């Protein structure tokens, strides 16, 4: 799928945070796209700073992989404002949304005003339901964003995708069962408890630690 880049002009200016999920960068290189990097710095609490230059496509990941920090509503509103002012598209990786526990962190970017005009969100069943290697994910492309993007995506999918494999489909469907939801919630709490235990241990020995609250992983210095 190359993370949706096939939807956009080859000359589009792409912004990717550093560090981030490496597939973003690999996908852009596979399509011979030019990429700019936005450093995520400790002094900014690993929050990407809003750029002063114009970019057409911005990759944001929340909870961030690999740092583990999730972005608040107040913070994301600044990115949406930037996208509106610069006619940009935010590609919003939200595959760990079920791990979010903080009340000021949205479970979806679409909780925020004007986000449907600026953002394409992608999610995954496999992270929440513990079958990451099997793979089952989906995009949300609002009609408000641009009437042509949804149409082009459907044409692209019809011609280049034969469908999710049957095992993954059954796993995704089963995740909506009442019994499955109980197991999924138990597992998510288990993973978050493990992350908290690791975080507390590192903090005890005076390491600096981020993440582990709205994500099942931590970043240690």
Say what each PLM segment does:
Residues 1-13:
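Phosphate-binding glycine-rich loop
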Residues 1, 20-24:
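Conserved coil-to-alpha-helix start sites within the AMP-binding
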Residues 12, 33, 85-89, 116-117:
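A short helix->loop->beta-strand "cap" motif at the edges of active sites that frequently abuts
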């Amino acid at each position: 799928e190359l993370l949706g880049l096939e939807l956009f002009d080859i000359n589009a200016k792409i912004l990717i945070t550093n560090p981030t999920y490496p597939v973003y960068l690999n996908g852009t290189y596979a399509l011979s796209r030019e990429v700019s990097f936005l450093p995520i710095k400790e002094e900014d609490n690993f929050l990407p700073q809003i750029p002063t230059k114009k970019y057409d496509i911005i990759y944001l990941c929340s909870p961030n992989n690999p740092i583990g920090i999730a972005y608040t509503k107040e913070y994301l509103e600044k990115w949406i404002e930037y996208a509106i002012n610069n006619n940009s598209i935010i590609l919003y990786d939200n595959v760990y949304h079920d791990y979010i526990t903080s009340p000021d962190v949205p479970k979806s970017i679409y909780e925020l005003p004007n986000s449907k005009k600026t953002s394409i969100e992608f999610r995954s069943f496999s992270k929440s339901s513990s079958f990451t290697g099997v793979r089952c994910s989906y995009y949300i492309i609002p009609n408000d964003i641009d009437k042509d993007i949804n149409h082009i995506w459907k044409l692209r999918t019809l011609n280049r995708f034969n469908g999710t494999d049957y095992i993954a489909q059954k796993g995704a469907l089963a995740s909506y069962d009442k019994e499955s939801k109980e197991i999924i919630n138990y597992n998510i709490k288990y993973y978050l408890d493990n992350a908290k235990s690791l975080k507390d241990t590192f903090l005890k020995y005076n390491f600096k630690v981020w993440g582990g609250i709205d994500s099942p992983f931590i970043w240690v210095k």
